[in-house]
């Protein structure tokens, strides 16, 4: 049985003759977002906003009819964009999973299950991009833009920073990220 980085002998026909080749075998890491049930989920909690990577496991948390609940946009982003539009695909699409109620985020209309397009003008390709976009921003407000033309939300940066630890404590979240 072939293992990662080993070679497998194969015979193919080219120009009417047999040709023997050795093909390298490797683990395909490109589909890791489609199923990773054996590791704890990644998340980032900020001002009551809970962000997580888009994955098949995340979508299956929507229930038995998760593919219908998720909608075509999220399914396309997870399963198809990397093949149809590789230049626009993201290494680790990030979702706003839910919003934990607190006065700092009370005016937000978008409450979760949406793809994050950019934060503070920076395109979000991974959880690391998201965290960096929040932590490096020095403006008075955070601007979070969502995919599928869902619009944007704003958070007062100072109020969000001040409320973050209280929100984590209220909801029993020990770490702001995992």
List each model region and its residues.
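C-terminal recognition in membrane/secretory proteostasis and scaffolding
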Residues: 1-178
């Amino acid at each position: 049985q072939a293992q990662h980085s080993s070679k497998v002998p194969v015979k193919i026909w080219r120009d009417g003759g047999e040709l023997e080749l050795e093909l390298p075998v490797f683990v395909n890491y490109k589909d890791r977002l489609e199923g990773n049930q054996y590791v704890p989920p990644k998340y980032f909690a900020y001002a009551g906003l809970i962000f997580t990577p888009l994955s098949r496991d995340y979508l299956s948390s929507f229930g038995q009819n998760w593919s219908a609940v998720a909608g075509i946009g999220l399914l396309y982003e997870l399963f198809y964009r990397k093949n149809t539009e590789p230049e626009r695909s993201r290494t680790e699409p990030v979702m706003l999973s839910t919003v934990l109620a607190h006065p700092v985020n009370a005016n937000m209309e978008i409450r979760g299950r949406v793809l994050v397009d950019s934060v503070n003008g920076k395109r979000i390709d991974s959880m690391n991009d998201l965290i960096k976009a929040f932590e490096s921003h020095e403006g008075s407000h955070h601007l979070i833009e969502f995919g599928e033309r869902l619009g944007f939300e704003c958070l007062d940066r100072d109020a969000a920073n001040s409320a973050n630890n209280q929100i984590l404590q209220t909801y029993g979240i020990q770490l702001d990220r995992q």
